[in-house]
Amino acid sequence: MKNAALLLAAAMLALAGCASAGDTAAASEAAPAESTAESAAAEDSTEAALPGEPHPLSAYSACAVSGSSVYTAVSHFSSSEDSLGNFDHSTVYKTDLTTGQTYEMYRTGSQLTSAPLIIDDTLYFICYDGGMLALPTTGGEARVLPFSYDDWMPVFYAGHYLYCRSVSAAPFCRTGGMRFNLENGETSPWNIPVETMYIPDVVGDALLLCRVVSDYPVPYPDDDEMSQALLQNTTLEYTLADPATGAVRQTCFTLPYDIPQPGSLTIYTYLGKCGSDFYFRADQCDDEYALVSQSVLRIGTDGTRTDLGITKTPDYLDYCAVLQGDEVRWLLTRGTDGIYLIYDTQGHEIGRNKRPAGLEAFFPLCMLDDGRLLMVVGYDWEHDSAARYAVMDADEFLNGGSAYREMTFAE
């Protein structure tokens, strides 16, 4: 695995703002179409060229993996009577998968995102109360850089720069971009189309960028009746865009961002990529907007769509992807009987497993470079309820086995 970022996706997406963006979009299917709308670019950035290869901020929400090390921040909430439930501190833990031990690296009074961005020998954690913690992995003094969590959503990094889009985004705001220097906290403008709704991934040297396409320019008006009418005629266009300039290189596919009648609502959630294919979970809702069924779509960069034919009822948990690095390897869901169903990227069932008796958790976070799984097998209540990690052979999991090597907390 590259020494890449595995940043808390949930924290990046749970931001307040006037955007209706995120990893989901209310939509019903439409055939791929070339956009006729012109994309307005933001102000020119200080430097057009990227300072290095672009890397995505991956969907692993609980931890960051670099080589044989796993890093995570865990929030501790007070259990004392006078401050019950109040945030108390965050602890950064490192797990060495070679030695099999987890130990405390750092403690702070700021609440941190769970998974850091890792560049070289430094961990970068966003602080919910403002700023960004830069923590060396090899020792040395921690620094706090100025960063506004309420205003900016990180989307990828290149070199020692973090590229962010504004939390206030299309279609009800004009989307802006910012380049953040991770060495000194300085900022500069970054080119991004003002119609950008969200940027779910990096594909090679391009961004997978979702933008609003409409005859009406953003921002849409606050008037509810007018905005609803506009949304019914708005298209969500997924493109491959230049990460430095925001210029569209290729239109891949489109989905209408409409306000459907009850019974015809489909909500798409981006799961990840594998090669030149993108994977979306499609949630079908009924007249009361309750979930009826869930399926997985594979959409190519040429717009070709394939329903993988693994539709499930609400009795199953949401489909999720098991990634190795930046690529989807498996699709996973679990029924009310507790049995995990595992599928390959073509939609073929390749295995089943069930949580062993006595374990409070048993699920794969990701696939490591060597093909083993990083598992969560429980939580340690004496260490801020931190996850108890284990490594497990992938074939063992696919074949329904339960043999794994658990990490232990160093005292």
Tell where the protein language model's regions lie, with residue ranges.
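C-terminal motif of bacterial Sec signal peptides marking the signal peptidase cleavage site
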Residues: A14-G17
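Surface-exposed loop/turn elements that mediate protein-protein interactions on large endomembrane-trafficking
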Residues: D44-H55, E81-R107, D129-F147, A170-P193, ...
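Eukaryotic tandem repeat interaction scaffolds
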Residues: T254-T333, Y340
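N-terminal low-complexity, Pro/Thr/Ser-rich intrinsically disordered segments
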Residues: A31-S61, S66
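Bacterial signal peptide processing site
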Residues: A19-G22
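Positively charged n-region of N-terminal signal peptides that target proteins for export
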Residues: M1-L8
